[in-house]
Amino acid sequence: MKLIRFLTAASPDVCFGVVIQNQAVPFAVLQKKAGKATPHLADSRSYLANLPDSERVAKELLAWGDLHLGEFGTGECHPLEMVRLLEPVEVAALFDFGLTPRHLKNSAEVLMKYEKDNPQTAPLLQAFAKAVMAPKPKAAPGRPEALSYYKCNMNSIVGDGETVPWPPYTSRLDVEPELAVVYGNEKQPVAGFCIFNDVSARDVQPTEFVGGFCLTKDMSKGNQLGPYLVTSDEVGDPSCDARHSRSSLDDGGGRP
C-alpha cells in the first residue's frame, strides 16, 4: 500500500489518501463511497497514532476502491501526474543515523580528497577519518549498541518533485538517496518506508564536526521525503532495497 499526502488544483486543503491504479484517492472520498467511516484516517498523524487498526481499515478501503474505481466521478480521484505530492507524513521528528560503516568511510575519503590542502579543515578530517575507521567497541551484555545520529532541520522537509535552491555559501552540494523508516507507535513501531534525499553542503561540513551540523544541513528544502509511505508488506526486506532518486538543484545564479 502506498500512502500519500497531496494537493489538487481545485482546493488548498491537504488530502491524505492512497494510490489506486495510478490515481490519488483521498481517504475521505473512499470512506464516503464505501460507507465505512473512521477517524483513524483523518490525516497522517491519526493514521500513525492508531496503528495497526488504521492500516487494516486503510487496506480494506484500498481493496474496495480497486474494485469500484470506475464508479468514481470527477474530482473524486486524480491522476498522480496532476497532483502535487507532499511529504507523505506530517513529520514530528527526523533523525539521520550513521549505520553503514562503508558509507561513513567513503564520506571521509571524499572529504579528505577535496580538503586535504586546507589547513583549517585537514586536521579535523584526519581525526574524523581515524574515528570512523577505528573498530567500534562491543556493547556491554544486555545493553543496546550506541548509535550516532543528528537531528534534521524540521523546517526544510518537503515532498517529491521539489527543486532544492543552491545555497550561496557552498560550491559542493551533495544529494544522498537514503531509506527512511517511519515510526508508528508502540503497538506497531514500523509504519512503513520512504525514500529520503539527504542534501549536504560538503565544503562547509568539516568545520562543523566539532559543534554539530548547521549550514551543512540547514538549506531550504534540504530534506526530501516521498513520494509515498510504503507499508512493510509491499517493501519486503528493506536491507535489500535499491533506492533510486532524481534530484533537481537550482543555483539561481548564486552558486560560487
Explain the meaning of each model-derived region.
Residues K2-T8, V19, K36-D251:
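Active-site microenvironments in enzyme catalytic cores
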Residues S11-F16:
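Short N-terminal binding/cap micro-motifs at the start of the first secondary-structure element
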Residues Q21-T38:
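A short, surface-exposed interaction/processing loop segment used at functional sites
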Residues G252-P256:
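Surface-exposed loop/edge segments in extracytoplasmic proteins
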